[in-house]
Amino acid sequence: FLQLVPDISGSIDNSNAIPLGFSSPVMVVDNSVFIFPTMGKDADNNIKRYTYNLSAQKLTGMVKMDVPANTMPINIIKVTNRKAYVPFYTLGVVWIVDIETMQKTGEIDLKPYSHKDSSPEPAFGIVRDGLYYLPLDQINENFMPYEDYRQVDVAVIDTKTDKVQKIISEKTSKLSFPTRPMLRNMIFTDEHNDIYIACAGNFGLNPTYLNNGFVCIPAGS
Protein backbone atom coordinates (compact mmCIF):
# COMPACT_ATOMS: atom_id res chain seq x y z
CA PHE A 1 0.00 0.00 0.00
CA LEU A 2 1.01 3.62 -0.58
CA GLN A 3 -0.25 6.65 1.28
CA LEU A 4 0.85 10.07 2.49
CA VAL A 5 1.23 10.40 6.25
CA PRO A 6 1.44 14.10 7.17
CA ASP A 7 1.19 13.34 10.91
CA ILE A 8 2.70 10.19 12.39
CA SER A 9 1.10 10.65 15.81
CA GLY A 10 -1.72 8.28 16.70
CA SER A 11 -2.61 5.19 14.70
CA ILE A 12 -2.29 4.61 10.96
CA ASP A 13 -4.11 2.06 8.81
CA ASN A 14 -4.47 1.40 5.10
CA SER A 15 -8.15 2.30 4.78
CA ASN A 16 -7.31 5.33 2.61
CA ALA A 17 -4.14 3.93 1.04
CA ILE A 18 -3.50 3.11 -2.61
CA PRO A 19 -3.03 -0.65 -3.15
CA LEU A 20 0.09 -1.67 -5.07
CA GLY A 21 1.25 -4.86 -6.70
CA PHE A 22 3.86 -6.91 -4.87
CA SER A 23 7.19 -5.04 -5.00
CA SER A 24 5.82 -2.41 -7.42
CA PRO A 25 8.50 0.27 -7.96
CA VAL A 26 7.52 3.80 -6.90
CA MET A 27 9.30 6.93 -8.13
CA VAL A 28 8.78 10.60 -7.26
CA VAL A 29 9.51 13.26 -9.88
CA ASP A 30 8.78 16.82 -8.76
CA ASN A 31 5.10 16.84 -7.76
CA SER A 32 4.28 13.53 -9.43
CA VAL A 33 4.34 10.02 -7.96
CA PHE A 34 4.71 7.20 -10.49
CA ILE A 35 3.76 3.59 -9.74
CA PHE A 36 5.22 0.95 -12.04
CA PRO A 37 3.83 -2.54 -12.64
CA THR A 38 5.08 -5.58 -10.82
CA MET A 39 5.95 -8.77 -12.69
CA GLY A 40 3.80 -11.87 -13.12
CA LYS A 41 0.21 -12.80 -13.87
CA ASP A 42 -1.27 -10.51 -11.21
CA ALA A 43 0.39 -7.37 -12.55
CA ASP A 44 -1.53 -4.30 -13.63
CA ASN A 45 0.14 -3.68 -16.96
CA ASN A 46 0.21 0.08 -16.72
CA ILE A 47 2.15 2.96 -15.24
CA LYS A 48 0.13 5.23 -12.96
CA ARG A 49 0.86 8.87 -12.20
CA TYR A 50 -0.58 10.62 -9.16
CA THR A 51 -0.20 14.31 -8.33
CA TYR A 52 0.67 15.45 -4.83
CA ASN A 53 -2.08 17.82 -3.65
CA LEU A 54 -0.41 20.02 -1.05
CA SER A 55 -3.58 21.56 0.42
CA ALA A 56 -5.35 18.23 0.76
CA GLN A 57 -2.19 16.32 1.70
CA LYS A 58 -3.25 13.56 -0.68
CA LEU A 59 -2.29 11.93 -3.96
CA THR A 60 -4.93 12.87 -6.53
CA GLY A 61 -5.65 12.94 -10.26
CA MET A 62 -4.54 9.45 -11.27
CA VAL A 63 -3.63 9.06 -14.95
CA LYS A 64 -2.36 5.78 -16.37
CA MET A 65 -0.59 4.47 -19.45
CA ASP A 66 -0.90 0.85 -20.56
CA VAL A 67 2.33 -1.07 -21.20
CA PRO A 68 3.11 -4.53 -22.61
CA ALA A 69 3.17 -7.34 -20.04
CA ASN A 70 6.45 -8.43 -18.44
CA THR A 71 8.55 -5.74 -20.12
CA MET A 72 9.83 -4.20 -16.86
CA PRO A 73 9.35 -0.44 -17.14
CA ILE A 74 10.81 0.52 -13.76
CA ASN A 75 11.86 4.17 -13.88
CA ILE A 76 11.11 7.46 -15.58
CA ILE A 77 13.55 10.26 -16.36
CA LYS A 78 12.24 13.79 -16.81
CA VAL A 79 13.63 15.67 -19.81
CA THR A 80 11.32 18.73 -19.88
CA ASN A 81 8.13 19.72 -18.09
CA ARG A 82 6.15 17.58 -20.56
CA LYS A 83 8.64 15.04 -21.86
CA ALA A 84 10.13 12.00 -20.14
CA TYR A 85 11.93 8.77 -21.00
CA VAL A 86 10.80 5.34 -19.78
CA PRO A 87 13.22 2.46 -20.49
CA PHE A 88 11.75 -1.03 -20.88
CA TYR A 89 14.27 -3.47 -19.44
CA THR A 90 13.29 -6.68 -21.21
CA LEU A 91 11.90 -5.03 -24.36
CA GLY A 92 15.06 -3.13 -25.24
CA VAL A 93 13.38 0.19 -26.03
CA VAL A 94 12.80 3.58 -24.44
CA TRP A 95 9.37 5.15 -24.66
CA ILE A 96 9.09 8.90 -25.07
CA VAL A 97 6.19 9.97 -22.87
CA ASP A 98 4.12 13.11 -22.31
CA ILE A 99 4.18 13.37 -18.51
CA GLU A 100 0.93 15.33 -18.27
CA THR A 101 -1.24 13.07 -20.42
CA MET A 102 0.73 9.84 -19.87
CA GLN A 103 0.66 9.17 -23.60
CA LYS A 104 3.45 7.57 -25.59
CA THR A 105 4.74 10.02 -28.21
CA GLY A 106 7.68 8.07 -29.60
CA GLU A 107 10.18 5.26 -29.12
CA ILE A 108 13.95 4.78 -29.14
CA ASP A 109 15.06 1.32 -30.25
CA LEU A 110 18.10 -0.05 -28.40
CA LYS A 111 17.82 -3.67 -29.53
CA PRO A 112 20.61 -3.32 -32.15
CA TYR A 113 23.06 -2.70 -29.30
CA SER A 114 22.34 -5.95 -27.46
CA HIS A 115 25.27 -8.34 -26.99
CA LYS A 116 23.48 -11.66 -27.64
CA ASP A 117 19.76 -11.57 -26.95
CA SER A 118 16.97 -9.22 -28.02
CA SER A 119 17.51 -6.56 -25.34
CA PRO A 120 20.61 -4.82 -23.96
CA GLU A 121 18.61 -4.23 -20.74
CA PRO A 122 18.48 -0.41 -20.56
CA ALA A 123 18.71 0.40 -16.85
CA PHE A 124 18.76 3.73 -14.97
CA GLY A 125 19.94 6.81 -16.84
CA ILE A 126 20.61 10.48 -16.22
CA VAL A 127 20.32 13.67 -18.29
CA ARG A 128 23.34 15.98 -18.52
CA ASP A 129 23.83 18.91 -20.90
CA GLY A 130 21.08 17.83 -23.28
CA LEU A 131 22.20 14.20 -23.43
CA TYR A 132 20.58 11.15 -21.84
CA TYR A 133 23.24 8.75 -20.58
CA LEU A 134 21.59 5.34 -20.29
CA PRO A 135 23.60 2.36 -18.97
CA LEU A 136 22.97 -0.99 -20.67
CA ASP A 137 23.21 -3.95 -18.29
CA GLN A 138 23.85 -6.59 -21.00
CA ILE A 139 22.84 -9.60 -18.87
CA ASN A 140 22.02 -13.24 -19.65
CA GLU A 141 18.97 -15.38 -18.88
CA ASN A 142 20.15 -15.71 -15.25
CA PHE A 143 20.17 -11.93 -14.81
CA MET A 144 23.98 -11.95 -14.60
CA PRO A 145 26.61 -10.42 -16.91
CA TYR A 146 27.82 -12.48 -19.86
CA GLU A 147 31.16 -14.10 -19.08
CA ASP A 148 32.45 -13.06 -22.50
CA TYR A 149 31.22 -9.46 -22.19
CA ARG A 150 32.57 -7.92 -19.01
CA GLN A 151 32.42 -4.25 -19.87
CA VAL A 152 30.27 -1.18 -19.28
CA ASP A 153 28.11 0.13 -22.15
CA VAL A 154 26.27 3.44 -22.01
CA ALA A 155 23.92 4.70 -24.72
CA VAL A 156 24.24 8.45 -25.29
CA ILE A 157 20.95 9.85 -26.58
CA ASP A 158 20.33 13.39 -27.84
CA THR A 159 17.27 14.68 -25.98
CA LYS A 160 16.40 17.10 -28.78
CA THR A 161 16.28 14.50 -31.55
CA ASP A 162 15.66 11.38 -29.42
CA LYS A 163 18.35 9.62 -31.44
CA VAL A 164 21.19 7.44 -30.18
CA GLN A 165 24.29 9.55 -30.71
CA LYS A 166 26.74 6.78 -29.80
CA ILE A 167 27.49 3.89 -27.46
CA ILE A 168 30.44 4.49 -25.15
CA SER A 169 32.16 1.57 -23.43
CA GLU A 170 34.69 1.00 -20.65
CA LYS A 171 36.51 -2.31 -21.07
CA THR A 172 39.77 -2.02 -19.12
CA SER A 173 38.43 -2.52 -15.59
CA LYS A 174 36.22 -5.51 -16.51
CA LEU A 175 33.36 -3.94 -14.58
CA SER A 176 29.81 -4.80 -15.65
CA PHE A 177 26.13 -4.45 -14.71
CA PRO A 178 26.07 -0.61 -14.63
CA THR A 179 23.14 0.40 -12.38
CA ARG A 180 20.06 -1.58 -11.51
CA PRO A 181 16.90 -0.23 -13.16
CA MET A 182 15.10 0.44 -9.86
CA LEU A 183 17.97 2.14 -7.96
CA ARG A 184 18.28 5.81 -8.87
CA ASN A 185 21.27 6.48 -6.61
CA MET A 186 23.53 4.16 -8.61
CA ILE A 187 24.06 7.00 -11.11
CA PHE A 188 24.70 10.63 -10.20
CA THR A 189 26.71 13.76 -10.98
CA ASP A 190 29.16 15.38 -8.58
CA GLU A 191 30.02 19.05 -8.04
CA HIS A 192 32.14 19.02 -11.20
CA ASN A 193 29.25 17.64 -13.29
CA ASP A 194 31.09 14.34 -13.75
CA ILE A 195 28.79 11.30 -14.01
CA TYR A 196 29.50 8.34 -11.74
CA ILE A 197 27.94 4.94 -12.39
CA ALA A 198 27.95 2.12 -9.84
CA CYS A 199 28.58 -1.31 -11.37
CA ALA A 200 27.39 -4.41 -9.49
CA GLY A 201 29.07 -7.14 -11.55
CA ASN A 202 27.99 -10.54 -10.22
CA PHE A 203 26.95 -9.12 -6.83
CA GLY A 204 29.81 -11.03 -5.19
CA LEU A 205 28.24 -14.38 -6.07
CA ASN A 206 31.05 -15.55 -8.35
CA PRO A 207 34.35 -15.96 -6.44
CA THR A 208 36.29 -15.84 -9.71
CA TYR A 209 34.73 -12.52 -10.73
CA LEU A 210 34.45 -10.04 -7.86
CA ASN A 211 34.89 -6.86 -9.91
CA ASN A 212 32.60 -4.04 -8.80
CA GLY A 213 32.96 -0.30 -8.42
CA PHE A 214 32.37 2.94 -10.30
CA VAL A 215 33.03 4.23 -13.78
CA CYS A 216 33.16 7.95 -14.50
CA ILE A 217 32.08 9.96 -17.53
CA PRO A 218 33.85 13.32 -17.08
CA ALA A 219 32.05 16.56 -17.79
CA GLY A 220 32.40 17.66 -21.39
CA SER A 221 32.99 14.16 -22.71
What are these regions (language model features)?
Residues 31-32, 81-82, 129-130, 192-193:
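Short coil/turn segments that connect the beta-strands within blades of beta-propeller domains
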Residues 49-51, 96-98, 147-162, 210-220:
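Beta-propeller blade signature
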